[in-house]
Amino acid sequence: MDDYSDPYYLPYSVVGNNFEIYYIPKAIDDYIELSQQICSEKKFNKKLFYCYQQLKLLPFWIKDELSIGDFIPPVVPCRDWGPKLHMYKGEWDKARDFILQCDKANAYYPNHGENELKELADFQYVAEIALSYISMHPGVLQKDIYTILNNQIPDINILKRFTRWSTQIRKEPYKRTNKLFVSN
């Protein structure tokens, strides 16, 4: 991956067909390639690695997008995946830093960065309650924890996301649900 810290050094890629040729800054070309890698990668750590690579290119891409139109595209892979992957791993400070870096690059619509920080705080709150309960009741059934914790959390959907994606818990299949344990 090239170093794009010098804004005056932006190598270009040539793309096009027989009728039109476009010169695309190499940073944008690399950004698009990383988007595909982020979206297709299944392993959390590798996906997160690609997110950090793309985060370095995000300011160039956002500037380019805003020069074309007045909006930020709805899908920005590193912005959409980076914080969530850290959340699923329980890395709250890293998730917060990732959100702040995306916000600094103007990758959010106004106030959406603040909304992401609130979502992070809500997810952390739910995760801490769920982890506490699971550690006191190892093997609790996934289907039961939703009912048990329903009155203690702001949004049941956050708990469902936590139990589905979190690497902080281990799931053992049991009948048509899972037994939940805190990961070591």
Model regions: which residues?
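Boundary/linker segments of alpha-helical solenoid repeat arrays
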Residues: 62-63, 104-116, 157-158
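TPR/TPR-like alpha-solenoid helical repeat scaffolds
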Residues: 66-82, 110-128
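Charged low-complexity interaction tracts in eukaryotic proteins
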Residues: 125-126, 157-184
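Short capping segments at the starts of secondary-structure elements
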Residues: 135-144
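Short helix-coil junctions and helix-kink-helix linkers
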Residues: 144-156
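Amphipathic alpha-helical repeat scaffolds of TPR domains
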Residues: 15-42, 49-59, 72-85, 128
